[in-house]
């Protein structure tokens, strides 16, 4: 969905811009043409899934999401398939990652951290009651909706209780090392519920401290710290918070506090609000149909290209901003609130914008690939989480106003923050800041009106 206009339609959904992408899946903004509802659609390539023997994992993810109906968990609406792709239609969350709050503020106040932690425990406790363990809990997988409610995402590595072996333990090592429980690293079998709670404890520490309890550039040294629970709480933690975190980050899973005990903890109970959620009977029998194993072609959807006015792409972008607040499209970078994706406005022609970004990125150690009105910037040097990669796209708002979005597609979020601040200094002549977002809003509204 670039300056050239046009869009793809799948079933009743009109696909828009890319929100994120990984090895096996791409997530796109979409709109239900029947109801007008905005959603996120995860798109998987069937050939890649088959080639990498990912069928079991994808079925597991879909089964997991269908089982969960909770206000603090991303909801799955439906699943579709074409001859070549699988489409998972999910709730669209527009408030960004909880990680963004930590990255921009350094740390949260204890009461704010407790509120998010309570919502996280509500979600995790409910998932466990449905036989689902997340196994990759970390701030990047915790999203916020427009009202600031926490939503747990990414169940791609979850394990249903039916997969527990005869010893009653899970055996697959998953997750991000800094957040993983010691018994998971040992790979001798572990209780999924206790392992998830350890990760929740690390998240609580990060929310309140602004940094990780276990950190080391050497992986074996990191593991040793995790095995020994070698950490110390900063002085600003309250005494009761310190005691609770030490009970959660107990390296012995048999003596580690349980969620039932945690919910009765005095620190946790302060201001606690029980969740309100709906119950639903869920049928998992239709999961096989998305891979068309029966040979039935009638359930397949058709993907087709439709030409549409390119100016609508801007409204699609705006609709993902909180409350249609156009001010969020023209972020003041001095505030430091750069997210995993960020955007700015420009009055320069689209080709000139891309050329200037390309010229600025080269000296910073990035290889640039150019296609239509998109750039892919690939870092030459390995970072903390692999090579940093940034996807850049230009959208036309009006004939004289463009919006430029830069999105991290691989690598470390903090390294992306540093990259964005550095490249911004070289793009000051490209970036346009309106005197008032209301003026920009009026201009866009006039373009939209017939």
UniProtKB/Swiss-Prot annotation:
Residues 339-368 are annotated as: PPI. It comes from Oryza sativa subsp. japonica (Rice). The keyword Manganese applies. Signal peptide: none annotated. Residues 154-183 are annotated as: Activation loop. One of its GO terms (molecular function) is ATP binding. The active site is at 136 (proton acceptor). It catalyses: L-seryl-[protein] + ATP = O-phospho-L-seryl-[protein] + ADP + H(+); L-threonyl-[protein] + ATP = O-phospho-L-threonyl-[protein] + ADP + H(+). InterPro entries: Kinase-like_dom_sf (IPR011009), NAF/FISL_domain (IPR018451), NAF_dom (IPR004041), Prot_kinase_dom (IPR000719), Protein_kinase_ATP_BS (IPR017441), Ser/Thr_kinase_AS (IPR008271). This is CBL-interacting protein kinase 23. It comes from the Eukaryota. One of its GO terms (cellular component) is nucleus. One of its GO terms (biological process) is response to nutrient. Induction: By drought stress. ATP binds at residues 19-27, 42. Residues 13-268 form the Protein kinase domain. Its cofactor is Mn(2+). CIPK serine-threonine protein kinases interact with CBL proteins. Binding of a CBL protein to the regulatory NAF domain of CIPK protein lead to the activation of the kinase in a calcium-dependent manner. Its EC number is 2.7.11.1. Belongs to the protein kinase superfamily. CAMK Ser/Thr protein kinase family. SNF1 subfamily. The activation loop within the kinase domain is the target of phosphorylation/activation by upstream protein kinases. The PPI motif mediates the interaction with the ABI (abscisic acid-insensitive) phosphatases.
């Amino acid at each position: 969905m670039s300056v050239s206009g046009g869009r793809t339609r799948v079933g009743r959904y009109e696909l828009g811009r890319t929100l994120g992408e990984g090895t096996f899946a791409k997530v796109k903004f979409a709109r239900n043409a029947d109801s007008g509802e905005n959603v996120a659609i995860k798109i998987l390539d069937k050939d890649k899934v088959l080639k990498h023997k990912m069928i079991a994992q994808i079925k597991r993810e879909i089964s997991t999401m269908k089982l969960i109906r909770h206000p603090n968990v991303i909801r799955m609406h439906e699943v579709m398939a074409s001859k070549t792709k699988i489409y998972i239609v999910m709730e669209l969350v527009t408030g960004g990652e909880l990680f963004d709050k930590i990255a921009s503020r350094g740390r949260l106040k204890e009461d704010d951290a407790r509120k998010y932690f309570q919502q996280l425990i509500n979600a995790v406790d409910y998932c466990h009651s449905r036989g689902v363990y997340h196994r990759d809990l970390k701030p990047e997988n915790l999203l916020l909706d427009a009202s600031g409610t926490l939503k747990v995402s990414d169940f791609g590595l979850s394990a249903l209780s039916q997969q527990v072996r005869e010893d009653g333990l899970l055996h697959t090592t998953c997750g991000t090392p800094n957040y993983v429980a010691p018994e998971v690293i040992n790979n001798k079998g572990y209780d999924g519920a206790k392992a998830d709670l350890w990760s929740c404890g690390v998240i609580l520490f990060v929310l309140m401290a602004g940094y990780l309890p276990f950190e080391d550039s050497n992986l074996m040294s990191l593991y040793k710290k995790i095995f020994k629970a070698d950490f110390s709480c900063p002085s600003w933690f309250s005494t009761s918070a310190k005691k609770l975190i030490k009970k959660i980050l107990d390296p012995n899973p048999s003596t580690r506090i349980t969620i039932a005990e945690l919910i009765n903890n005095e620190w946790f109970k302060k201001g606690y609000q029980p969740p309100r959620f709906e119950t639903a009977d869920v049928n998992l029998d239709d999961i096989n149909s998305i891979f068309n194993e029966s040979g039935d072609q009638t359930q397949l959807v058709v993907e087709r290209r439709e030409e549409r006015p390119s100016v609508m792409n801007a409204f699609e972008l705006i609709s993902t901003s909180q409350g249609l607040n156009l001010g969020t499209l023209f972020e003041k970078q001095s505030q430091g609130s750069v997210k995993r994706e960020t955007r700015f406005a420009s009055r320069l022609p689209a080709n000139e914008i891309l050329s200037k970004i390309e010229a600025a990125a080269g000296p910073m150690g990035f290889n640039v690939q150019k296609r239509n009105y998109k750039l892919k910037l690939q870092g030459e040097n390995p970072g903390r989480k692999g090579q940093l990669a940034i996807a850049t796209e230009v959208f036309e708002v009006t004939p004289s106003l463009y919006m430029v979005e830069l999105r991290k597609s691989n690598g470390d979020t903090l390294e992306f923050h540093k990259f964005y601040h550095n490249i911004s200094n070289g793009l000051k002549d490209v970036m346009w800041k309106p005197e008032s977002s209301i003026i920009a809003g009026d201009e866009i509204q006039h373009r939209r009106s017939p």
